[in-house]
C-alpha cells in the first residue's frame, strides 16, 4: 500500500506557510501521497472544528499513513487519536514543536489541552512516534515537547537553534522531518 502523509498546521498558519509546501513537494517527488490539511479558522481555532476536519480523513487512514503536525496541530492530532477506533496502527506520527499542556503565553488555546491525554491509546495508535523540538523555541518551551515525548514514548529530536520552526525564522524547509519520515519508511520495507 502506498505511503501517505497528512501534514497538519498550527495556530495562525495555513497549508502555504513555513516548511509545509517544501515537505509535500519532497514527498510527492518520492512517490509518497502527501496532503497539507487546511484546518478551519486558524486565527481563532476551536478543537471541535479541528477534530471534525480530521475526521473527514478517518476512512483513508491505514498502516502506511503518517501524520506530521506542527505546534497546535500536535494536541489536535493527539485528541483525534484518543477517540479514533483503528483496525491497524498508523505508520507513525511526527510532532514538531509539540505540546500537551497549556501554553502560558497562548491560554486562548487551552481548549486543546484541557484534561489529561490518554497516552496509552496514543501509543497504541501509531507504530512510530517522534517529537522534534528546538531548545530556543519561544512559543512552546522545549521542556513541554520533551515531556510530551516521554509521555507518548516517542523519539525526541533536539534542535539547538530552530525557534518555533517558522517561515519568518528562516524555515521554508525542515529536512529533519523528511529524514525521520524516510527512516520510518525504510524500516517498513525491510
From Swiss-Prot:
Record protein name field: Putative hydrolase YdeN
Keyword vocabulary terms for this entry: Hydrolase
PANTHER family with a match to the protein in the record: SERINE HYDROLASE RBBP9 (PTHR15394:SF3)
Oxidoreductase among keywords: no
Pfam families cross-referenced by the UniProt entry: Ser_hydrolase
Enzyme Commission (EC) number: 3.-.-.-
Active site positions, chain numbering: 71 (charge relay system), 137 (charge relay system), 164 (charge relay system)
Family membership: Belongs to the RBBP9 family.
GO molecular function: hydrolase activity
Statement: the UniProt record of this protein carries the keyword Kinase: no
Signal peptide per UniProt: none
Amino acid at each position: 500500500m502506498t505511503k501517505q502523509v497528512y501534514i497538519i498546521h498550527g495556530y495562525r498558519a495555513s497549508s502555504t506557510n513555513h516548511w509545509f509546501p517544501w515537505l509535500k513537494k519532497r514527498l510527492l517527488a518520492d512517490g509518497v501521497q502527501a496532503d497539507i490539511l487546511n484546518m478551519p479558522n486558524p486565527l481563532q481555532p476551536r478543537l471541535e472544528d479541528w477534530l471534525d476536519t480530521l475526521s473527514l480523513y478517518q476512512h483513508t487512514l491505514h498502516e502506511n499513513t503518517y501524520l506530521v503536525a506542527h505546534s497546535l496541530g500536535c494536541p489536535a492530532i493527539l485528541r483525534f487519536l484518543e477517540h479514533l477506533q483503528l483496525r491497524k496502527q498508523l505508520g507513525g506520527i511526527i510532532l514538531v514543536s509539540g505540546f500537551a499542556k497549556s501554553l502560558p503565553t497562548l491560554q486562548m488555546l487551552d481548549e486543546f489541552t484541557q484534561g489529561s491525554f490518554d497516552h496509552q491509546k496514543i501509543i497504541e495508535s501509531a507504530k512510530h512516534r517522534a517529537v522534534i523540538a528546538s531548545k530556543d523555541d519561544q512559543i512552546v518551551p522545549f521542556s513541554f515537547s520533551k515531556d510530551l515525548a516521554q509521555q507518548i514514548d516517542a523519539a525526541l529530536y533536539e534542535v539547538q537553534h530552530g525557534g518555533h520552526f517558522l517561515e519568518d525564522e528562516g524555515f521554508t524547509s525542515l529536512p529533519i522531518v523528511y529524514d525521520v519520515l524516510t527512516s520510518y519508511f525504510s524500516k517498513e520495507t525491510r
